[in-house]
């Protein structure tokens, strides 16, 4: 006689009971949500009903790279099913005349776009803070100019999380052009200060314990695509301008954590990120000095947290490899 335990599909009744249990939980809590089974037996997807149609301010810093920016804007326009948004493109230190020619066409083509100009030197934190102060939305969606929207409901998937009272930020699943993973959450201490877990894993993989296909909390997510409540952004005083290039989004998420706000990753908001896999190499003395300075600043500010280890990552797993393999003793 064969055991039904060997075949998960034979226990459909148990999974249906699990679905009903989740639905009953939401009903008791007064949360309007739909629950559906996933392809993984015993794993469920909950979709919380969005309240109203709040204005989303999408903030995109830009320097030249008009082809990247146009692809980003056109994908937002053509694919997004959530339409109550504005886009703030923040021009900063562009050098090419064609960039400014494009801006004129851009504002005529996309009625939802506003062009802002940052007149000082590059500082990712300061640029985004500047735009946030001029934004009209109840939520800020920080977005890189080199991304392309893949899933039409990308905004809703993050918004349904951010509308929950205890959630401060939501991040998306980002892919390299070859469909490998670029971002699926950030682990503190991975590779030194912090790193993207599952980076370069197959885009079709489920990941360790299904982490690539599950909504879950992380210590941080990348600001290449991150949705934040305006009130929570103000609560932590935005991005810290001392982090000019590196660690600004990690620091921001850690500050949210200090205020008992959750940072959540969703695999259901998906975008391409056309960042070269070799990008970010500190290949000049100036860049190396700046990176070292920001590394020391992060270590000074978050030394206790680094020493404790990431609360969302097992101490038995490697912090030198990003694949959740076992840590070497």
What are these regions (language model features)?
Residues 1, 22, 154-158, 212-237, ...:
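A short, conserved alpha-helix in the catalytic core of glycosyltransferases
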Residues 10-53, 168, 178, 190-217, ...:
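C-terminal, non-catalytic tails of nucleotide-sugar-dependent glycosyltransferases
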Residues 54-59, 86, 251:
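Cell-envelope/extracellular polymer assembly enzymes that use nucleotide-activated donors
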Residues 74-84:
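Short, acidic, metal-binding catalytic loop of nucleotide-sugar glycosyltransferases
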Residues 91-102, 120, 148:
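A conserved acidic beta->alpha catalytic loop
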Residues 118-135, 153:
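Glycine-rich, basic loop-to-helix element that forms the pyrophosphate-binding segment
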Residues 140:
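Short aromatic/hydrophobic "clamp" motif used to bind/position activated sugar donors
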Residues 147-193:
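Conserved donor NDP-sugar-binding/catalytic core segment of glycosyltransferases
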């Amino acid at each position: 006689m064969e055991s039904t335990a060997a075949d998960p599909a034979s226990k459909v009744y148990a999974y249906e009971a699990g679905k009903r249990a989740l639905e009953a939980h939401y009903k008791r809590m007064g949360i309007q949500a739909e629950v559906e089974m996933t392809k993984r037996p015993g794993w469920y997807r909950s979709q919380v009903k969005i309240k109203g149609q709040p204005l989303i301010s999408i903030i995109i810093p830009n320097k030249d790279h008009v082809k990247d920016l146009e692809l980003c804007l056109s994908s937002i326009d053509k694919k997004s099913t959530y339409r109550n948004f504005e886009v703030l493109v923040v021009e900063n230190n562009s050098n090419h005349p064609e960039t400014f020619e494009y801006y004129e066409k851009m504002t005529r083509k996309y009625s939802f776009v506003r062009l802002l100009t940052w007149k000082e030197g590059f500082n990712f934190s300061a640029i985004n803070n500047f735009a946030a102060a001029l934004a009209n939305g109840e939520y800020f969606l920080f977005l890189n100019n080199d991304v392309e929207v893949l899933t039409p409901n990308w905004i809703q998937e993050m918004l349904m999380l951010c509308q929950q009272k205890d959630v401060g930020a939501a991040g998306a699943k980002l892919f390299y052009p070859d469909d490998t993973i670029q971002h699926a959450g950030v682990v503190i201490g991975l590779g030194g200060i912090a790193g993207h877990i599952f980076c370069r894993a197959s885009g079709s993989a489920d990941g360790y314990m299904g982490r690539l296909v599950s909504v879950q909390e992380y210590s941080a997510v990348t600001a290449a695509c991150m949705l934040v409540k305006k009130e929570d952004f103000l609560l932590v005083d935005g991005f810290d301008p001392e982090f000019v290039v590196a660690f600004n989004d990690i620091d921001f998420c850690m500050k949210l954590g200090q205020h008992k706000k959750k940072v959540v990753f969703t695999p259901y908001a998906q975008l391409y990120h056309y960042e070269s896999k070799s990008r970010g190499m500190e290949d000049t003395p100036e860049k190396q000095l700046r990176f070292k300075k920001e590394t020391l600043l992060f270590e000074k500010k978050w030394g206790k947290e680094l020493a404790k280890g990431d609360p969302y990552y097992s101490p038995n797993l490697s912090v030198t490899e990003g694949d959740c393999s076992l840590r070497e003793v």
